[in-house]
């Protein structure tokens, strides 16, 4: 069969043929998509990665041997066809196909391979479990939508490299076998055979190495980097994922953000033909949380959070009053047109709120000139009017409220806001709302560990005005919690697609931050000693950013999960149904690396 290909060379991809090819003799290679027999005339749709074209075997125009060969064809047979391109007869055109005005009259047929019966059809919108799709990923990837996703991924790679190389960046690969460090998700560990008892870690990001490349004087680095995190998975997470990673010397936050905006603008124009306006809007972390309940707000719709805590201190409704007077937060959302929600739908919203930590949800419905609610009996007439004024309430609105600790109130209303927007079809999926979230806190308090933790990572620089207060903060976590960082996150339609910061570039400040994070001098030296040492040899000011490539691709393609833009993803349990990974290994292999495995019977 392979010998046949020596004389049979493809002229065109199926999807590239058009009316300019009418009259041409062409050679095509691909897979049989469908076979139809209409009155003895055999029609096949031949498919390759660029599309589909109709091939006709008409017994009145070809020999018996060729016709009988064509009759044997079934779905997913691999074939070569030589024939001439014709315009389809009037009335038989297919406007749904890119090649729907033409067909190829088959004159030669090579059957290069046959196929078993398929576990699912090779078409879009199939109703089959993701588990089955991933088990037969080689078939799933034949589907046109999946091929488009993988090709688009390649085009994004190319555009990223073009832009960054054109802006003075050098592509450098950093190690995949590195050292386990604290302050992050769990590491994937790799045992060393030569240094028994010791382990490499797969990198969660190239963070330390890219900073060291700045110390090395390369000034502008980038890498399309594989990263690994052993964490619980969800729709937008994978144990291994890809970042567009970059770092720059002698830069400010504005420099990095401007470069990142231009990169996104270039990629969207080059790959999708979409014009993105820059600069992007900027919003402080505090404003994002206060208005939208999240540090990655979706700005395609309103439903902003409204603070009624001061009013809640005055009313006799105990739930509001107790929370407001104990330092909590009472906030609401005005759902315009929400009065049409039934009591059952309001109860469903309450149950949804409870999933995220709410104890309940108060509501007020304004309908036909009346306000109805179980809580209004606790409000005076003046307090009711003040509430309606604060909430900008009009007839036809539904007001919902959460009263709890500050972080819970924001979190719950943030999720409710998104849920309501989806339920009421308020989201314009054609819009691209880019946003920078800036002025993040440098630290947050971990209640479980009873210590400060870094919001981003421990190498993020504090704002200049906070650097002089580092010593003071060592004895006062409250002071440290007021520090702002030189960090920035890029958000698109409510998804964080990238983030970075200006880094700490002096050993003194880095050591102070480690102290605030309760990382001892010994631990810092053991885990990060090579970085602190490097910073002491004239490290330039530097900063950078990493984009989540898989997430950007999911947004570009409208995919519900990043698994649809990765060729060979894992399931939500971290399993590869195609290969069966992870799997047990032999006792011999374990012995070579000095490991004994104890498996929990449960």
UniProtKB/Swiss-Prot annotation:
Gene Ontology biological process terms, A to Z: aspartyl-tRNA aminoacylation
Major subcellular site: cytoplasm
Reaction(s) the record says it catalyses: tRNA(Asx) + L-aspartate + ATP = L-aspartyl-tRNA(Asx) + AMP + diphosphate
CDD domains: AspRS_core (cd00777), EcAspRS_like_N (cd04317)
Keywords tagged on the record: Aminoacyl-tRNA synthetase, ATP-binding, Cytoplasm, Ligase, Nucleotide-binding, Protein biosynthesis
Descriptive protein name: Aspartate--tRNA(Asp/Asn) ligase
Keyword Chloroplast in annotation: no
A cellular-component GO term for this protein: cytoplasm
Subcellular location, record wording: Cytoplasm
Family in the record: Belongs to the class-II aminoacyl-tRNA synthetase family. Type 1 subfamily.
Alphabetical list of InterPro entries matching this protein: Aa-tRNA-synt_II, aa-tRNA-synth_II, aa-tRNA-synth_II/BPL/LPL, Asp-tRNA-ligase_1, Asp-tRNA-ligase_1_N, Asp/Asn-tRNA-synth_IIb, AspRS_core, GAD-like_sf
Quaternary structure note: Homodimer.
Pfam families reported for this sequence: GAD (PF02938), tRNA-synt_2 (PF00152), tRNA_anti-codon (PF01336)
Record-level Gene Ontology MF annotations: aspartate-tRNA ligase activity; aspartate-tRNA(Asn) ligase activity; ATP binding; nucleic acid binding
